[in-house]
């Protein structure tokens, strides 16, 4: 089934020799590229070699079975054959997953954009709780976070926020968070005890590199203005806030979180590049209906993906029909279990398509 992987093993061994060659190491750019290729192949090669060892051991055990003349040894061989057959089946499934086409964005940093939706002040409070949840999850993963821009709303609420998350595999873990998140609870201001429903929209964008997106200066309109705080009052006496409009697409990015205009412009450009990259990917995906079906949900940000029900203390992800009854822990960043299940579901759907 995996015979063509022998050539992958040969390539891996060849790479091992190359990355240890002093002449190759001297060319840092080429060496880094080869090291990445080596690291990408290593999990597949290790699993394949383990799989081949198990196949060889199984064949040897089957040849021995019935020839030892020792009943105790025969029973041991039967047990070992059963264990090896189970392991080989597991190896095959793991190899299939390792051979699935990789998302080229998986290892990238991300921008998480959270916007309050329907529900007024409650929606703003919920958007703030989602921001905190992703910050705490990132801390647990030893990733770094940086607020690129934030617009506050009401008391402690957020109208809109853009946060950058830097860390290995950030996009691979957070990409399933895109969509509409719904909260059901009794607001503190609700005297009758009636449950209100509010929403917040989350968009997760991979950080675009210069090679991904080329932006012509003539396509940009850059406006500067004084940063405003909660309620619209000016919080800065200089024109430090920056608004960048990409004229061909109409995309607008505003950044006023820093006191420096230069820093705000730099942050705004990073976000703009990622939004343009996301737009380009979206256009490509319009021609890939089958690929869209293989994703968890549709990837549409208008899709309701998850409900946070406070009275029942539960979180339900509607894409995989999974419910967790540890709401506060979840909001404190313990979302790994849900992400693992979403990843497994996504892989299973892609395997179905391959088969």
From Swiss-Prot:
Gene3D superfamilies: 3.30.160.20, 3.30.70.1660, 6.10.140.1950. Disulfide bonds: none annotated. Its main location: cytoplasm. The modification N5-methylglutamine is found at residue 233. InterPro entries: PCRF (IPR005139), Pep_chain_release_fac_I (IPR000352), Pep_chain_release_fac_I_sf (IPR045853), Prokaryotic/Mito_RF (IPR050057), RF-1 (IPR004373). It is found in: Cytoplasm. The keyword Transport does not apply. Residues 283-293 have a biased composition (Basic and acidic residues). Methylated by PrmC. Methylation increases the termination efficiency of RF1. GO terms for cellular component: cytoplasm. This is Peptide chain release factor 1. It comes from Finegoldia magna (strain ATCC 29328 / DSM 20472 / WAL 2508). The gene is prfA.
């Amino acid at each position: 089934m995996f015979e063509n992987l022998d050539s992958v093993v040969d390539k891996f061994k060849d790479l091992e020799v190359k990355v240890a060659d002093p002449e190759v190491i001297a060319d840092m750019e080429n060496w880094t590229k080869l090291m990445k290729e080596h690291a990408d192949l290593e999990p597949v090669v290790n699993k394949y070699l383990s799989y081949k060892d198990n196949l060889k051991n199984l064949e040897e055990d089957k040849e021995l079975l019935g020839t030892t003349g020792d009943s105790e040894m025969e029973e041991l061989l039967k047990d070992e054959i059963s264990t090896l057959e189970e392991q080989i089946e597991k190896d095959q499934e793991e190899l299939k997953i390792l051979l699935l086409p990789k998302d080229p964005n998986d290892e990238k940093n991300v921008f998480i954009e959270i916007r309050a939706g329907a529900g007024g002040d409650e929606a703003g409070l919920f958007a703030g709780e989602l921001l905190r949840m992703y910050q705490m999850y990132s801390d647990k993963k030893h990733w770094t976070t940086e607020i690129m821009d934030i617009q506050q709303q009401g008391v402690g609420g957020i109208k809109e926020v853009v946060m950058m998350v830097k860390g290995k595999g950030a996009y691979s873990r957070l990409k399933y968070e895109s969509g509409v998140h719904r909260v059901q609870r009794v607001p503190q201001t609700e005297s009758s005890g009636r449950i209100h429903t509010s929403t917040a929209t989350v968009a997760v964008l991979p950080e675009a590199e210069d090679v991904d997106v080329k932006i012509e200066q003539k396509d940009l309109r850059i406006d500067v203005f004084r940063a405003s705080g909660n309620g619209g009052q000016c919080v800065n006496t200089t024109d430090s806030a920056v608004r960048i409009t990409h004229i061909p697409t109409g995309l607008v990015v505003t950044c006023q979180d820093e006191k420096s205009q230069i820093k705000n412009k730099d942050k705004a450009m990073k976000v703009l590049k990622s939004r343009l990259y996301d737009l380009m990917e979206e256009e490509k995906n319009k021609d890939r209906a089958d690929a869209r079906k293989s994703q968890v949900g549709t990837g549409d940000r208008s899709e309701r993906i998850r409900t946070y029900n406070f009275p029942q203390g539960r979180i339900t992800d509607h894409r995989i029909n999974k419910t967790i009854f540890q709401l506060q822990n979840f909001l404190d960043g313990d979302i790994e279990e849900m992400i693992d299940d979403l990843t497994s579901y996504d892989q299973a759907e892609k395997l179905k398509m391959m088969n």
